């Protein structure tokens, strides 16, 4: 059976953590930032975890992670 391919978009956007979870960046932080409040932009900093309901989909996109 041939090797499964990893989705390039997923490997660029997600990092695998030791416990089996995935780390992701926040959306809505690239452009059109003038109309967003300082509080909103501050809360979009950093990273968060992929939700448990989506972990199975992410694992299918990254079979060797």
UniProtKB/Swiss-Prot annotation:
GO cellular component terms given for this protein: cytosolic large ribosomal subunit
Gene3D superfamilies the record matches: 4.10.410.60
Domain of life: Bacteria
GO molecular function, one term: structural constituent of ribosome
GO biological process, one term: translation
InterPro entries: Ribosomal_bL35, Ribosomal_bL35-like, Ribosomal_bL35_sf
UniProt keywords, alphabetically: Ribonucleoprotein, Ribosomal protein
Cross-referenced HAMAP family: Ribosomal_bL35
Cited NCBIfam families: rpmI_bact (TIGR00001)
Family label: Belongs to the bacterial ribosomal protein bL35 family.
The name this protein goes by in its record: Large ribosomal subunit protein bL35
Source species: Chromobacterium violaceum (strain ATCC 12472 / DSM 30191 / JCM 1249 / CCUG 213 / NBRC 12614 / NCIMB 9131 / NCTC 9757 / MK)
